[in-house]
């Protein structure tokens, strides 16, 4: 009854925040076995407190475009929970950004950061600004205007933002530069920085590498591996590119990539150098890959199956959704399973619909939910914070080894929790309960 009461209250209070509802529903319904066995969480109103952000900040961002016209966007930062450490989570610049999207991401971040073993609370922020089609100077002016409002709410031990969709190293650089001018301090207030001013080696690789490490841990328990296996990857940003890179390093065969216009299937395996050239150097579209590689086929989004994504209709052993939320529908899940897919590891945040997740759990495949499988990115952000605090940078090998260790620990924690609650293949339950228990314990200890 406790969970049902919370969900009804949430629906009544925020009727139009569907992404936030989806994230909360997925998380707290899997907490039922814990909540039924321990009534102290209800006594301390932990769910009520957990789903309500500690602070929501919304602000106007005014900036000048290249024609000297004033443009107005909306910025926000949702500081969700700081029970186990300073707020930590990315900034997203995309037209789809609204309160519901940022709250869903912030809520997910709380549980994800709890799993990392590091002292980080959860937050998320961003703007409906679209960097696509903007000049370098326009992006710089927007970032500076955005930081003019945000700077008073963040700090190295208060709230440490990072990048997300639309916010890469370039944008972080402009944001950091403006923060430094405003406060006259050089401190680790942002992660994802360039290597010349406090960034960490292995940061851009971290989410993709970590996702593959987590998938390997899941498969190892079943006496299997990714070596020699065909893998489907969606997206073509940092997460997808470095998922593909790590898959190639361990001898797997990734055959797909995508962007908002369509997807490519390369039967010979993805040419990583060409993909990086198109996406990281030219900032081009994925269809350019098919124009240059005869072994590749391009499918535009208008030719995708109705209610589905063509990436997931390519037969594969393992799937790595690495683009955006709700990119993998129930139709896609059925297709993956009927084509013999044995492993799904989520590089993106909430890429699978709740119905799709239900099918994966029912089929008892190796399913790594995003808050566990993609926690490598924020883990290395935490390691970047540690390097900034000590003023001592670490080598790529040291950071990668620490990342690998963290992903192993996350898997161990999630797997042991699932076994504790008599559902050993349910890593959704394992991840949510493991993440929740740590945060809830800290909240109870700190009082109301």
Swiss-Prot record:
An example GO CC term for this entry is: cytosol
Tell me the Gene3D superfamilies matching this sequence: Glutamate Dehydrogenase, chain A, domain 3, Leucine Dehydrogenase, chain A, domain 1, NAD(P)-binding Rossmann-like Domain
- The record places the site described as Important for catalysis at 164
What's the Enzyme Commission number for this chain? Answer: 1.4.1.4
Q: Name one GO biological process term.
A: glutamate biosynthetic process
Active site per the UniProt annotation: 124 (proton donor)
* CDD domains linked: NAD_bind_2_Glu_DH
Give yes or no: UniProt keyword Acetylation.
no
Residues where NADP(+) binds: 207, 238
The enzyme class is oxidoreductase
Q: Which reaction does it catalyse?
A: L-glutamate + NADP(+) + H2O = 2-oxoglutarate + NH4(+) + NADPH + H(+)
* Positions annotated to bind substrate: 88, 109, 112, 163, 381
- Alphabetized UniProt keyword annotations: NADP, Oxidoreductase
Q: Which GO terms describe its molecular function?
A: glutamate dehydrogenase (NADP+) activity
According to the UniProt entry, the coiled-coil residues are none
One Pfam family in the UniProt entry:
ELFV_dehydrog
Cite the record's note on assembly.
Homohexamer.
Q: What does this protein do?
A: Catalyzes the reversible oxidative deamination of glutamate to alpha-ketoglutarate and ammonia.
The cross-references to NCBIfam families, in alphabetical order and at most eight, read: PRK09414.1
Give the family, as the similarity comment puts it.
Belongs to the Glu/Leu/Phe/Val dehydrogenases family.
* Stated name of the protein: NADP-specific glutamate dehydrogenase
């Amino acid at each position: 009854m406790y969970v049902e009461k919370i969900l009804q209250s949430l629906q009544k209070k925020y009727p139009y925040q569907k992404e936030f509802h989806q994230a909360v529903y997925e998380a707290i319904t899997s907490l039922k076995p814990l909540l039924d066995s321990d009534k102290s969480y209800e006594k301390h109103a932990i769910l009520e407190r957990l789903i309500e952000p500690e602070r929501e900040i919304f602000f106007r961002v005014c900036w000048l475009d290249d024609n000297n016209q004033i443009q107005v966007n909306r910025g926000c930062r949702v500081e969700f929970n700081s029970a186990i450490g300073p707020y930590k989570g990315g900034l997203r610049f995309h037209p789809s950004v609204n309160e519901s999207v940022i709250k869903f991401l912030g809520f997910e971040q709380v549980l994800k950061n709890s799993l990392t073993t590091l002292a980080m609370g959860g937050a998320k922020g961003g703007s409906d600004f679209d960097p696509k089609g903007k000049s370098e100077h326009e992006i710089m002016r927007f970032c500076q205007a955005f930081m003019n409002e945000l700077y008073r709410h963040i700090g190295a031990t208060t709230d440490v933002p990072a990048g997300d969709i639309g916010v890469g190293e370039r944008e972080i650089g402009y944001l950091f530069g403006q923060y430094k001018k405003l406060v006259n301090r050089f401190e680790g207030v942002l992660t994802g920085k360039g290597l010349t001013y406090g960034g960490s080696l292995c940061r851009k690789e971290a989410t993709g590498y970590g996702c593959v490490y987590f998938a390997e841990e899941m498969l190892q328990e079943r006496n299997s591996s990714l070596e020699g296996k065909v893998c489907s990857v969606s997206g073509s940003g940092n997460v997808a590119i470095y998922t593909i890179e790590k898959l190639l390093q361990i001898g797997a065969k990734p055959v797909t990539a995508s962007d908002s216009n369509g997807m490519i299937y390369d039967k010979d395996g993805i040419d990583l150098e060409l993909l990086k050239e198109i996406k990281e150097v030219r900032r081009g579209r994925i269809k350019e890959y098919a124009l240059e590689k005869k072994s590749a086929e391009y499918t535009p989004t208008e030719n995708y199956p109705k209610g589905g994504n063509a990436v997931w209709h390519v037969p594969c052993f393992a799937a790595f959704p690495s683009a955006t939320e709700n990119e993998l529908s129930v139709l896609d899940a059925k297709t993956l399973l009927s084509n013999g897919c044995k492993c799904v590891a989520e590089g993106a945040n909430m890429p699978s619909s709740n119905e799709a997740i239900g099918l994966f759990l029912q089929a008892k495949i190796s399913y790594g939910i995003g808050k566990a499988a993609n926690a490598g990115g924020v883990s290395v952000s935490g390691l970047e914070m540690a390097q900034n605090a000590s003023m001592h940078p670490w080598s790529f090998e040291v950071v990668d080894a620490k990342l690998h260790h963290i992903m192993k620990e996350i898997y161990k924690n999630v797997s042991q929790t699932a076994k504790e609650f008599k559902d050993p293949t349910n890593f959704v339950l394992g991840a949510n309960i493991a993440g929740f228990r740590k945060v809830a314990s800290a909240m109870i200890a700190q009082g109301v």
